From Swiss-Prot:
Protein purpose: Protein modifier that is covalently attached to lysine residues of substrate proteins, thereby targeting them for proteasomal degradation. The tagging system is termed pupylation.
Protein name, as recorded: Prokaryotic ubiquitin-like protein Pup
PTM remark: Is modified by deamidation of its C-terminal glutamine to glutamate by the deamidase Dop, a prerequisite to the subsequent pupylation process.
Spans through the membrane: none
Record remark on domains: The N-terminal unstructured half of Pup provides a signal required to initiate unfolding and degradation by the proteasome but is not needed for pupylation, while the C-terminal helical half of Pup interacts with ARC to target proteins to the proteasome.
Length: 68
């Protein structure tokens, strides 16, 4: 056991990297806001599409759920 610590002959595998994998740099606040805005715009566009094709069914479904 002591020899394993001194000489490094323990259970370490040869294919293990010595350094951790690189991580992506943190995203800036402006980039995060832009990505969130794009997601919101996509969702609103989808809602508009549903309303254009079948507004009556959308309203009935909304009223049946109690308007919540």
């Amino acid at each position: 056991m002591a020899q394993e610590r001194i000489f490094g002959t323990g259970s370490r595998r040869e294919d293990e990297p010595d350094t951790p994998a690189p991580v992506d740099p943190p995203v800036s606040g402006a980039a995060q806001a832009q990505r969130d805005m794009q997601g919101t715009d996509d969702l609103l566009a989808e809602i508009d599409g549903v309303l254009e094709t079948n507004a009556e069914a959308f309203v009935k479904g909304f009223v049946q759920k109690g308007g919540q």
